[in-house]
């Protein structure tokens, strides 16, 4: 009696026919049909009690469920998901707990099943996620110890122009400090936005960026007009290695959340509509979206503004007593031990600090920022490479 590929009901009926023939014992039938003796006796008993109808598959759902989720709670979970389409079940529950602390809520997995049953779980195409930063965020464990800044791609407006969302986040709390659409990735539009962030939240200890404009350049120390201004404000400048966005993974994950939440609304919208969408995303991300890395708290509940207040009046860059100070000439050169050494025209008419470090090398800094080392053998400045957390500073 081979186990034939047929429907389960037909198989059960054939089993009963063979049993009724009295040619086989129950053990032989169970072995032949590849079922246990317990199952064989169950089929026989149901046939004897109910006839052929007793052989149909029965629902495994319990007749009564003492922990069934009330309909009003299900409705709240579904409504919250619809209001925040990018939220998963955990974030939906965390938001409901904030809004209604006294409301009893189901487990994360049950909430997930509720959303799936409501057709609100969309299967995503797989993308390799940004892993945890391969270098530890030594500077990003306290509020305002390290901020990240970058542009979130580009979105075309209804007028055919491009919008480049400039974003700033605090690494420790994940709080989005600024998210503003600009029409160009240049100093002229980046500085006013950064000034607003500084006025609103104070100054960080350090800022992490990639190596693109207007954050970095190929000049000494990679300085630009924007990052030079940061140095003059007493902010440490950190950069990721070229082509290594994983070193700014927290910020990149926020960008992914932004695109999933409002990417469709951004495309082809007016400039005002795009900025309204960016502002709405910030409010949701900061005040309503919980983060597991924050013990399922929101960024707004964790973040506090910096005690270092911003002043538009810059103080002269200071140097230590063990540093020799030189003025940078209009052509970007300094004079050292009888040699004219090119540093950077960006620093023309500014002062730099020099200190002999070892052998024939002389360290050159603008404020706390390392520009490079003068090689006395070649009388040239060898540029520094400043990377994120742990690199030269």
Role assignments for model-derived ranges:
Residues 1-14, 63-71:
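Short, Lys/Arg-enriched anionic-surface-contact patches
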Residues 7-24, 74-83:
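Short, amphipathic alpha-helical "recognition" segments used to contact nucleic acids or chromatin
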Residues 15, 29, 40, 51, ...:
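Mobile genetic element proteins and their domesticated derivatives, centered on retroelements
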Residues 52-146, 154, 224, 298-310:
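Basic, flexible linker segments flanking DNA-binding modules
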Residues 109, 113-175, 183, 187-205, ...:
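Mobile-element integrase/transposase regions
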Residues 219, 225-311, 353, 357-358:
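Charged alpha-helix within mobile-element recombinases
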Residues 282, 286-393:
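C-terminal, beta-rich DNA-binding module of retroviral/retroelements integrases
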């Amino acid at each position: 009696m081979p186990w034939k590929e047929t429907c389960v009901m037909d198989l059960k009926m054939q089993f009963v026919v063979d049993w009724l023939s009295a040619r086989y014992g129950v053990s032989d039938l169970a072995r032949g049909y590849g079922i246990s003796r317990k199952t064989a006796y169950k089929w026989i008993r149901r046939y004897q009690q109910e006839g052929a109808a007793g052989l149909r598959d029965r629902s495994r759902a319990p007749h009564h469920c003492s922990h069934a989720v009330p309909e009003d709670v299900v409705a709240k979970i579904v409504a919250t998901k619809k209001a925040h389409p990018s939220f998963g079940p955990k974030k939906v529950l965390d938001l409901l707990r904030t809004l209604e602390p006294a409301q009893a809520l189901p487990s994360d997995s049950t909430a997930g099943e509720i959303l799936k049953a409501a057709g609100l779980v969309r299967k995503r195409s797989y993308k390799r996620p940004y892993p945890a930063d391969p270098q530890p965020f030594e500077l990003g464990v306290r509020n305002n110890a390290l901020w990240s800044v970058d542009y979130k791609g580009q979105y075309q407006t209804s007028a055919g122009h491009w919008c480049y969302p400039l974003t700033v986040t605090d690494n420790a709390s994940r709080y989005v400090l600024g998210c503003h659409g600009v029409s160009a990735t240049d100093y002229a539009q980046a500085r006013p936005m950064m000034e607003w962030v500084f006025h609103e939240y104070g100054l960080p200890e350090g800022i992490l960026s990639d190596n693109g404009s207007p954050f970095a350049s190929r000049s000494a120390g990679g300085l630009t007009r924007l990052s030079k201004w940061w140095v003059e404000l007493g902010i440490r400048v950190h950069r990721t290695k070229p082509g290594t966005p994983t070193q700014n993974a927290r910020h990149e994950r926020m960008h992914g959340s932004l695109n999933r939440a409002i990417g469709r609304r951004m495309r082809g919208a007016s400039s005002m509509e795009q900025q309204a969408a960016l502002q709405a995303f910030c409010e949701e991300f900061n005040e309503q979206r919980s983060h597991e890395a924050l013990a399922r708290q929101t960024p707004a509940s964790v973040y506090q503004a910096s005690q270092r207040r911003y002043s538009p009046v810059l103080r002269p860059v200071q140097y230590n007593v063990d540093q020799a100070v030189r003025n940078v000439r209009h052509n970007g050169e300094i004079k050292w031990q009888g040699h004219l050494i090119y540093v950077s025209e960006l620093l023309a008419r500014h002062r730099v600090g020099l200190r002999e470090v070892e052998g024939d090398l002389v360290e050159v800094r603008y404020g706390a920022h390392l520009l490079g080392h003068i090689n006395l053998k070649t009388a040239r400045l060898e540029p520094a490479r400043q990377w994120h957390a742990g690199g030269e500073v």
